[in-house]
Every structure is written in structure tokens, then in C-alpha cells.
């Protein structure tokens, strides 16, 4: 698989001198003809095995440089899932975190098995019945999940504890909604909101 991806990348590099000379890029469309489950792609990452993962409004796709493989984001034990994929992240344990319109699922990349992320805060709050905008990790290995209709969650992997943060408690609830999140190289977590500016945690 990696050899196919390498050949694909080399074929692109072959044309780079032309790109530099003309200032133009040639884009090759990867669509339903290649097996893509939906043309509305909301998230893209490359995993540690070299595969490209695409989250769409109708399914999770894995691309090996030639063809697509569609995955059913479904927890067989709990018997529920969701196919509207909005965020993707791979952690240090080669687990793929999949944000959907109904919370977060975790896929073991080695087995392909999905499990629903059902951790709860001390007050019993759970990331569910809400769409996920971002998933990322900070320098300490904590997983941060941005669920705009609920707030920002921090999951301590070592302890299994989940914490919820509301960036800017306000009478206007719509302004509390986090819209984007990132971690800078100093380890500070930045949260952009819908109408109340930007906040940071450190």
C-alpha cells in the first residue's frame, strides 16, 4: 500500500517543475467513481500507516492511493452509530477518533472495530446528541473535543476522567458556542467562539 502511495506522490513530484514555472496546480478529482461514499467531505487526515481518511456526510472512507474502503461507524455492542463524520484524529495508540453528529467513536486501526466514547464528567455529562467540530491532543496527551452545542471537553487519557469547559458563560447562550480550537507549540489551548472572541487555557 505504501509503495502505491509513494508512486502516486512521485508522479505528482514529476510535474512540480511545471507547477513552479506556471504558478498553477493540477488537481485530480477523487469522487464517487473511486468509491467515495459522499461528495461532501468534512474532514481529512493521514494515519500512521499512510492511509488517507475522509469523513463525509455519509460515511467514513479510507483511501490507499488507488481505491476507497467504506467503514460503518457503528458500535456493535451498544448497537448505535452515526455516518455523518465531521472530525478525525489519530492518537498515540493508533486509535482513530471519529467525531460525528452524535458524539465520538473510537476505531482501533489494527482491527477496524468501533466503540462509542461514553466517558462522563463528574456531574454525569456525556458527549452525545451533538455534532463534533474538532478533536486534537495537547502536549500532555489529553484529548480535546469541541462540541459546539455543549462546549469544550478535555479527556485525561491516563485517568479516564472527562472535564467540560464553557469558554464564556453568557446570558446569550449562542455566544458560548465554541467554533474552533487549536494547541500552539507552547501547549496553550485556544478556543474561538461564535460571538465572544477567543479564549485560551494553559
Q: Which sequence ranges carry the predicted segments?
A:
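Carboxylate-rich, polar loop motifs that coordinate divalent cations or form catalytic acidic clusters
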Residues: 1-202
Amino acid at each position: 500500500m505504501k509503495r502505491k502511495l509513494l508512486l502516486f506522490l512521485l508522479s505528482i513530484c514529476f510535474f512540480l517543475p511545471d507547477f513552479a514555472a506556471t504558478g498553477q496546480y493540477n488537481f485530480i478529482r477523487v469522487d464517487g467513481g473511486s468509491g467515495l461514499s459522499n461528495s461532501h467531505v468534512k474532514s481529512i487526515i493521514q494515519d500512521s500507516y499512510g492511509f488517507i481518511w475522509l469523513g463525509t456526510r455519509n460515511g467514513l472512507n479510507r483511501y490507499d492511493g488507488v481505491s476507497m474502503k467504506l467503514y460503518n461507524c457503528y458500535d456493535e455492542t451498544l448497537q448505535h452509530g452515526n455516518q455523518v463524520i465531521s472530525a478525525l484524529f489519530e492518537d498515540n495508540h493508533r486509535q482513530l477518533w471519529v467525531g460525528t453528529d452524535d458524539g465520538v467513536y473510537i476505531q482501533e486501526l489494527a482491527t477496524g472495530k468501533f466503540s462509542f466514547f461514553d466517558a462522563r464528567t463528574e456531574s454525569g455529562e456525556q458527549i452525545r446528541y451533538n455534532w463534533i467540530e474538532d478533536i486534537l491532543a495537547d502536549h500532555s496527551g489529553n484529548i480535546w473535543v469541541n462540541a459546539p452545542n455543549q462546549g469544550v471537553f478535555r479527556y485525561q487519557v491516563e485517568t479516564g476522567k472527562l472535564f467540560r469547559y464553557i469558554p464564556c458563560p453568557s446570558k446569550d447562550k449562542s455566544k458560548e458556542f465554541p467554533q474552533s480550537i487549536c494547541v500552539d507549540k507552547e501547549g496553550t489551548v485556544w478556543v474561538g467562539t461564535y460571538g465572544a472572541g477567543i479564549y485560551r487555557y494553559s
